[in-house]
């Protein structure tokens, strides 16, 4: 396969949802230059994976630290400062005003971009009702997106189904990072609001988070390259 355009390659974020640093390093080695952007979430971070952020950054890779910070402002700010020092590119916080304000202030004018999580892509209207909300996913996502834009957050994490509507709300410059991406024929897993890579890009997503379709593929590098090719065709 021809070498991918780095701009297209970096729109794919591979989720390193593995239980150990050794497993993460093995997958990174398999993927080689086919992937330029990785996500480290709870599982790997709590298994000693945070130093991998700095290692990947030194190797010229981008890293999305998906810890969904949500605490009092001072605690959030200190966490942002620590993660920024490791060289992270993206960091998630929950889309509550105090949390977002603290994260944006602590980020300053560094290269770290703060992403606000609107509503988890595993949630639907019935889940919100169970949690006591009196309105649905769409209304909550829109309200939180407008708050995030006003506060100065750099991007949103949203389902691909919401990307087109949110792009109209936040404009062309804000990052829209979408999990719930499944190539045609892939199992949905625990995601309820999913879309193929090409459709998500066409809908307005700036970056696609893909885990199992790459991590569990017989040939992970080939799977990643196929997704990047689909991104390039949709751009």
Curated annotation (Swiss-Prot):
Entry's Gene Ontology molecular function annotations: orotidine-5'-phosphate decarboxylase activity
- Matching PROSITE patterns: OMPDECASE (PS00156)
The family classification in the record reads: Belongs to the OMP decarboxylase family. Type 1 subfamily.
Could you tell me the superkingdom of the organism this chain comes from? Bacteria
Please name the source species.
Rhodopseudomonas palustris (strain BisB5)
Q: Which named protein is this?
A: Orotidine 5'-phosphate decarboxylase
Q: What is its EC number?
A: 4.1.1.23
At which positions is substrate bound? Answer: 17, 39, 66-75, 121, 182, 191, 211-212
Report if keyword Transmembrane is assigned: no
What pathway is it annotated to? Pyrimidine metabolism; UMP biosynthesis via de novo pathway; UMP from orotate: step 2/2
Keyword check for Plastid: no
């Amino acid at each position: 396969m021809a070498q991918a355009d780095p701009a297209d390659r970096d729109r794919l974020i591979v989720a390193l949802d593995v239980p150990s640093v050794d497993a993460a390093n093995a997958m990174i080695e398999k993927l080689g230059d086919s992937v330029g952007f990785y996500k480290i979430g709870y599982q790997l971070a709590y298994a000693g994976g945070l130093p991998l952020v700095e290692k990947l950054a030194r190797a010229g890779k981008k890293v999305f630290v998906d810890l969904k910070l949500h605490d009092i402002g001072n605690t959030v700010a200190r966490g942002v400062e620590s993660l920024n020092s490791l060289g992270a590119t993206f960091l998630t916080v929950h889309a509550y005003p105090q949390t977002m304000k603290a994260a944006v202030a602590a980020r300053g004018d560094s290269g770290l971009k703060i992403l606000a999580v609107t509503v988890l892509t595993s949630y639907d209207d019935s889940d919100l009702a169970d949690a006591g909300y009196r309105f649905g996913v769409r209304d909550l996502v829109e309200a939180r997106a407008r708050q995030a834009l006003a506060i100065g957050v750099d991007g949103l994490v949203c389902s691909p189904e919401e990307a087109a509507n949110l792009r109209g709300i936040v404009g062309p410059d804000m990052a829209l990072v979408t999990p719930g991406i499944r190539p045609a024929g892939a199992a949905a897993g625990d995601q309820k609001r999913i879309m193929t890579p090409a459709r998500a890009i066409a809908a307005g997503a700036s970056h696609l988070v893909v885990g199992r379709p790459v991590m569990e593929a017989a040939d992970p590098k080939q799977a990643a390259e196929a997704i990047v090719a689909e991104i390039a065709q949709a751009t």
